[in-house]
Amino acid sequence: MRRVVVAGRWDGARPLLPTGVALEEIGQGVLAGCADAEPVLLPFGAGPTFDEAVAASRSQASFVCVPTDVASTREAGERVAAALGESRVVVEGGHNASPDCGLGFLAGLLGVADSEVSGDALPAALTRAEELVAASGTDLVCAASTPRPLLGLDSVLAIDPDLTPIEAQNTALTGLLTQAFAHRPLGRRQLIESSIGHPARGYGSGAGGGVGAIIAASGGRIVPTGALLDDLLTLNKALQSADLLIVAEPELASPLLATSTLDSLTSAAAAHALPVVGCTVRSSLSHVERAEWGLHGVFETETRVTLREAGRRIARTWLR
C-alpha cells in the first residue's frame, strides 16, 4: 500500500466545498490514479477548517473560533467565560477585517457592558480578567492564525488583511492600549511563545482582532495555529510510513502564505524526507519560492480541473 496524506484547507476556494469534502475528493482521485494507495485525510488550517481539524480533539479541550468577519468579539468572550474551569480552552483567531482590539472579548469574558472595559476602565478590567483566569485554573490558549501583533507598524490596526496600509489611525486608542497593556499580566506567570514583554506587541497578539492580546494580558498563552494543530493531531505520527503529502491550499501566493499553516505541514514532511505536492486553484510562486516553502510540486486546478481529477493526476505522477 502507498500511504498518501491529504492535508490542508479549502475554505473559500472553488469549488465551494467544506475542507473535509474537498480532501475526500482529492483522496478519491488518488485512489483512481493508484489502486494500491491509502489516502489519509487531515483537515489542517485556520477558520472553518480549524473546527473540522479539532473535531476529534474535543475531549482534550474546549475550542472557540473568532470569525474574521465579525465586528465584535464579545460572543467569543462569553463562550470562554462559560468554559472556564475546564482544563484547557483554545481560542482560534486570524486577521480580522474590523478589529475591536479584543475589547468585546474582554467584556464578554467578564460579563459586563462594553462601556466597562473602555477608556479609563480598561486597566481595571484587564486586572479582573487576569484574576478570573487564574482562579479558574484553566490553561487559556490563543491559537494565532496571524503572526501580526495588535500594536505596531505591522499590526492589525495598521494593515488590512489584504495588506493595504490603514491610513486613518486612532492615536488616542493606540495610546490607551499601549499604556493599559504595559507590564501585564501582573502575575507574570504567562510566557508568550515567541515573545515576552508588552503583550499587545507580541507574536499573534492581533489574532481575533486583538483577542490574542487580551488572552496574553490575562495570563494565557499565544501559540501559532499550525504548532497547536501539529501537537493535537500528532502530525508526525500521521506522516510516519507515508509516501507522499498532498497539501490543499486555496491560493499559493507568498503574502497569503505568511498567515497559513503550510509551513507546519511542509516542515513536518521534511523531517520524514517526504515529497510534498501543493494542490491549489492558482499559484504565483516561483521555483525558488516553492523550494523555500518546502513544495516539490504544484498542481493548479485553475477552477477548470476537478479536485478528483487533480488527485488522480498527482497520484499518476508521484506514485509511479
Enumerate the language-model features and the residues they cover:
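N-terminal loops that bind phosphate or other acidic moieties
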Residues: 1-320
